Amino acid sequence: MEINGKERHFEYLIKAYDDICALCPDEDMSRIGEKFSNPSESVDMAISCAVILNKCYEDHQHHISPDYKPDYLTREDFDFEPVSIMHEVTGEIMKAFREGNRQTVKTEPVNKKGKNA
């Protein structure tokens, strides 16, 4: 998504888990919804999560390719964005959470031998 004129990406990996837990009541990730459901805290929470998840994405890209220069999203990048952008930001955050929590299983092809092969 575009924020402050730049395309931004978000990624939820182990690196981001502790930082996001620190934002939750009692540092309990299962209570993150309390922050998003409180109107006076939801915008601040979304911005904080976006900054953390973007840093995770940028650091991951740099780790994969050391020539990649991270360009981190900052809280100030949101200063002159319309409030309506927060719906899209929240959607992107939730998408990153879903992707980061998705379990994948690698399987090897079955090598059948014998009579039924």
Please annotate each region the language model reported.
Residues D44-C56, G91, K95:
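Short, hydrophobic/amphipathic alpha-helical patches that form generic packing surfaces
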Residues L13:
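Residue-level signal for threonine
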Residues E2-I3, A22, D26-S37, Q61-A117:
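Charged interaction scaffolds used for protein-protein
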Residues F10:
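Active-site-adjacent beta-strand anchor residues
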Residues Y17-D19:
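A short local loop/turn or secondary-structure capping micro-motif enriched for an aromatic residue
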Residues G5-E7:
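Glycine-centered positions within short beta-strands or beta-hairpins
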